[in-house]
């Protein structure tokens, strides 16, 4: 049995979809409507987060960063192999950016997380969302959705409910997120701007915590060590999850190692 109540999560997303025109009118920057495909991909992303937490996979550990890249692939392309083949160019370009972007790739996210393990789970989840969205962004596309799933992953590992977009929180979520994408995480100004944004978004996440999104109120809590040493490169050869045990929404071989796919450096 999983940790997340996916039907309740879907119900919240469907309400946002139905009322999106009203929500959009309240935003300073108009957003594209939520299509059925966007919702299906988000639900597959939540299912993937569920499995990662159940299997105690630390996506910040060397050799496991590829699971964050997989989350982005899911929100953009879903899990259908044919659909993914259509996006092969974007997937490859995103992979290169993810590993190589100066000051904005996975290295930045992992280092930020390692420096803030002593903070509350709300601050860590918020900070990682901010790192993903602020310039330079972690991914080419889908940073908002993938960032929300990353925050949900961190929260769920601590036994907290995931963040889920709802009619009641949509405006409060979209407006600062739009500002974030134009805010640089580099340079001296970031030292003044980002901490305040982190604190406000952490309070927002805490205010949105809804136990209905969990199948049980005592969801698994994974201990977070006070420090996390980086393993050597041999960890990259560690076997990934066995695809045959993955839950139905992510049945394609998303967890198995592929020798043709770039591994964590």
PLM feature segments, named:
Residues 1-265:
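FIC/Doc superfamily catalytic core
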């Amino acid at each position: 049995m999983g940790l997340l109540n996916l039907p309740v999560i879907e119900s919240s997303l469907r309400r946002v979809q139905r009322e999106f025109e009203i929500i959009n009118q309240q935003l300073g920057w108009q957003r594209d409507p939520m299509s059925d495909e966007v919702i299906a991909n988000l639900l597959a992303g939540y299912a993937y987060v569920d499995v990662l937490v159940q299997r105690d996979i630390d996506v910040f550990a060397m050799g496991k960063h590829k699971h964050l890249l997989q989350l982005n692939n899911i929100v953009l392309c879903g899990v259908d192999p044919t659909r993914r083949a259509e996006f092969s160019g974007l997937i490859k370009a995103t992979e290169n950016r993810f590993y190589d972007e100066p000051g904005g790739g996975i290295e930045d996210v992992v280092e930020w997380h390692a420096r803030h393990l002593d903070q509350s789970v709300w601050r860590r989840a918020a900070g990682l969302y901010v790192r993903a969205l602020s310039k330079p962004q972690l991914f080419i596309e889908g940073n908002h959705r993938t960032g929300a799933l990353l925050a949900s992953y961190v929260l769920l590992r601590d036994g907290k409910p995931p963040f889920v977009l709802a009619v009641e929180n949509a405006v409060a979520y979209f407006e600062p997120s739009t500002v974030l994408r134009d805010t640089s995480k580099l340079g001296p100004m970031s030292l003044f701007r980002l901490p305040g944004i982190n604190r406000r978004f952490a309070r927002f996440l805490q205010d949105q915590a809804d136990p209905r999104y969990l199948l049980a109120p005592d969801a698994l809590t994974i201990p977070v060590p006070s420090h996390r040493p980086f393993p050597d490169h041999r960890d990259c050869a560690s076997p990934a999850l066995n695809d045959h045990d993955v839950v139905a929404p992510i049945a394609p071989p998303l967890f198995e190692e592929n020798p043709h796919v770039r591994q964590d450096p």
